[in-house]
């Protein structure tokens, strides 16, 4: 077989595809996020184009997927509490700021997220003292 990759020449087997289908790194690891893309970003964003191991990319991908699932679950709960079906930046803000660990991890400002409803304790004490004076 000139020009083709057959078994007699030492290619990868039958060209008609009788072998197993290729599995991506994400599928092997049981992940939804793309390990190959994360590996490419890791390689491109390091100084001096350093080498990145395949397991490092899988690990980072798994962490990103877990954090995304955690934030989406909390934001979905916030949307459900407000009886709406669409997650908005406000729900993301409430979810992230409501969880202590996520709040310390994500210190970014979320656009159109608003602020948490909170009244300073000192201001509450002044209002209570005024009520007591008017009652007496």
From Swiss-Prot:
Acetylated once deposited into chromatin. Residues 1-12 have a biased composition (Gly residues). It comes from the Eukaryota. Residues 1-29 are annotated as: Disordered. It is found in: Nucleus; Chromosome. Gene3D superfamilies: Histone, subunit A. Signal peptide: none annotated. Pfam families: Histone, Histone_H2A_C. InterPro entries: Histone-fold, Histone_H2A, Histone_H2A/H2B/H3, Histone_H2A_C. Keywords: Acetylation, Chromosome, DNA-binding, Nucleosome core, Nucleus. CDD domains: HFD_H2A. The modification N6-acetyllysine is found at residues 5, 12. GO terms for molecular function: DNA binding; protein heterodimerization activity; structural constituent of chromatin. SMART domains: H2A. One of its GO terms (cellular component) is nucleus. The nucleosome is a histone octamer containing two molecules each of H2A, H2B, H3 and H4 assembled in one H3-H4 heterotetramer and two H2A-H2B heterodimers. The octamer wraps approximately 147 bp of DNA. H2A or its variant H2A.Z forms a heterodimer with H2B. H2A.Z associates with the VPS72/SWC2 subunit of the SWR1 chromatin remodeling complex. Also interacts with RBP1/DNA-directed RNA polymerase II largest subunit. Variant histone H2A which can replace H2A in some nucleosomes. Nucleosomes wrap and compact DNA into chromatin, limiting DNA accessibility to the cellular machineries which require DNA as a template. Histones thereby play a central role in transcription regulation, DNA repair, DNA replication and chromosomal stability. DNA accessibility is regulated via a complex set of post-translational modifications of histones, also called histone code, and nucleosome remodeling. Belongs to the histone H2A family. This is Histone H2A.Z.
């Amino acid at each position: 077989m000139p020009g083709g990759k057959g078994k007699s020449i030492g290619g990868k087997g039958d060209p008609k595809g009788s072998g197993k289908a290729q599995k991506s790194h994400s599928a092997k690891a049981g992940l939804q996020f793309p390990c190959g893309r994360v590996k490419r970003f890791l390689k491109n964003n390091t100084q001096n184009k350093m080498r990145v191991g395949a397991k490092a990319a899988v690990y980072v991908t798994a962490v990103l997927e877990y954090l995304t699932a955690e934030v989406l679950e909390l934001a979905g709960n916030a949307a459900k509490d407000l009886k709406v079906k669409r997650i908005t930046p406000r729900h993301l803000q409430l979810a992230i700021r409501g969880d202590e660990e996520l709040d310390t991890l994500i210190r970014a400002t979320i656009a159109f997220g608003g602020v948490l409803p909170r009244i300073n304790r000192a201001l509450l004490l002044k209002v209570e003292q005024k009520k007591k004076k008017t009652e007496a």
